[in-house]
Amino acid sequence: MNLDFSATIPQIPFILEGLAITLKIVVVSAIIGLILGIVLSLCKISTFRPFIWIADFYTSVFRGTPLVLQLMIVYFGLPQLLGFQIDQFWAAVVALSLNSAAYVSEIIRAGINAIDKGQKEAAVALGVPYGKMMKDLLLPQAFKNISPAIVNELITLTKESAIVTVIGLGDVMRRAYQAGAATYNYLEPLIIAGLIYYVLVLILTFIGKAVERKLKSND
């Protein structure tokens, strides 16, 4: 059977309309995931054991269960407890950001632990407050070291965002499926969707390498 894009080409603008939703989901989820990931990483390196246990348990749960399960619990399960339906967009953001935070926290923790311990000891000896030490000394160095890993997590988040199609959110993937249903040809719209995601990943990869080169030039 030959590929025939004649019926799919008119559907491309419809598929591209889902790009705005995809990008909004990724950007909002990435920001929330990064903030929560920083908090979790600080809990993991703290000396207060309950914080360590909570952060490790959180990471274990969200890394040890499928993202699609987490999304379906948020969208289909939580309303059963809360008594009201959660908006599709925010259900997607909650699930993706909570999942991403688990991975980001491990990346940041590793970045902080890779910094020479002598710097932390010197800051403590000089009486630098913990918050100021983290904000001005350790976190900037950690982010400099882990920027490639953070970009990789953003790329993963971009690709995983396609999973929101299971709750009917009109992203690129969902619209590609709808275009296939309208034309009775599913492969061609899915190829178009694949190309869109591929271009997004290429752009993020280019940005990540540019940032990495910039950071190296500042060393």
Swiss-Prot record:
Membrane topology: Multi-pass membrane protein
PROSITE patterns membership: ABC_TM1 (PS50928)
Deletion phenotype: Cells show impaired growth on arginine as the nitrogen source.
UniProt feature coiled coil, ranges: none
Membrane-spanning intervals of the chain: 19-39, 51-73, 88-108, 149-169, 187-207
Residue stretches making up the ABC transmembrane type-1 domain: 19-208
InterPro entries (alphabetical): AA_ABC_transptr_permease_3TM, ArtM/GltK/GlnP/TcyL/YhdX-like, MetI-like, MetI-like_sf
Biological process according to GO: amino acid transport
Keywords per UniProt: Amino-acid transport, Cell membrane, Membrane, Transmembrane, Transmembrane helix, Transport
GO cellular component: ATP-binding cassette (ABC) transporter complex; plasma membrane
Keyword NAD on entry: no
GO molecular function terms attached to this record: transmembrane transporter activity
Chief location category: membrane
Places the protein is found: Cell membrane
Function: Part of a binding-protein-dependent transport system for arginine. Probably responsible for the translocation of the substrate across the membrane.
Protein family (similarity comment): Belongs to the binding-protein-dependent transport system permease family. HisMQ subfamily.
The protein's name in its UniProt record: Arginine transport system permease protein ArtQ
Species annotation: Bacillus subtilis (strain 168)
